């Protein structure tokens, strides 16, 4: 109790604020670009590429974050990424055409990859009350997209679909001086750099991270509107879509803030397996036609898993950023694959078979993790 105030929440909140500020443009581009392609000088057929290429580049770049953070300091690296992220948002408003926007999306993908990893490293810190810190970090950072989407529709109707990104880009530049106030985080407890984590190593942890992201993130997100199409009237209103997405983000904020202390109370290692099994249960409920119940269970369990997962990953090595990079790599690959496989699975096999298969895969990966996972090293 007496040692905890020495750490405090300063770094956790500042790092989260940096991500939230530069996240504004990316959150809104998914709503605005499909509705106003001509305003950005792009064809409707290229929108999918622009909205997905950022995920590809961040997967490729995760491996560079840990060595660069050791060399230059995590705060300097975060500040540089904030510059790139803010400039990418400004580019949405000031540039046009597929080629230039493609470069801007590549910049954002690289920037997000850096800030996402350093954010979690700052939140994890020395491991004390990691659940509370990671949950708070995610809650604060997600307020950026909540505000971007909540205000975005009104701003677009007021200043137009391009100038809104200039406003958001200028706001993102505020993250740069904030990032420089963070500590360097060169090493994690010793002057000797920790052994680099093998990002692509197939082990029970990484497979479970992949499978959960595949089903609960990728497939679920890509197919939810199709699942609900017969139950909820579809609206294309810009403000309505923005507020709907903002409400989903706000729910994530609340659940992250509440879930963090729960993770500390019950310990991350004890929650990973039950949380994964609950996700499997949510998937099978959707397969059986209980879409509402399954969706609620998935959303809640996935938020808790998003807190538990990086904590478990960080405990595996003194190279915190490298370990979190491995977690993010497998999660992002699952997310990207799920977005594709979900649509194809719905088309070829229908949603009952698709979701039943995902449930079985999640249960199997959880069982493998339970039987084969090794405990974290003593220093973690």
Where are these regions (language model features)?
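Short amphipathic helix-loop junctions that connect adjacent transmembrane helices
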Residues: 31-45, 222-240
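Loop-to-transmembrane helix entry
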Residues: 42-53, 132-136, 233-249, 322
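Central cavity-lining transmembrane alpha-helices of secondary-active solute carriers
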Residues: 49-66, 243-258
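Helix-to-loop junctions at the C-terminal end of transmembrane segments
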Residues: 61-73, 156, 254-267, 346
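Structural signature of the two symmetry-related core transmembrane helices
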Residues: 76-90, 169, 270-285
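Cytoplasmic helix-loop-helix junction between adjacent transmembrane helices
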Residues: 106-141
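Intracellular juxtamembrane helix-capping segments at the cytosolic ends
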Residues: 114-127, 304-318
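Symmetry-related core transmembrane helices of the 12-TM Major Facilitator Superfamily/SLC fold
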Residues: 164-180, 355-370
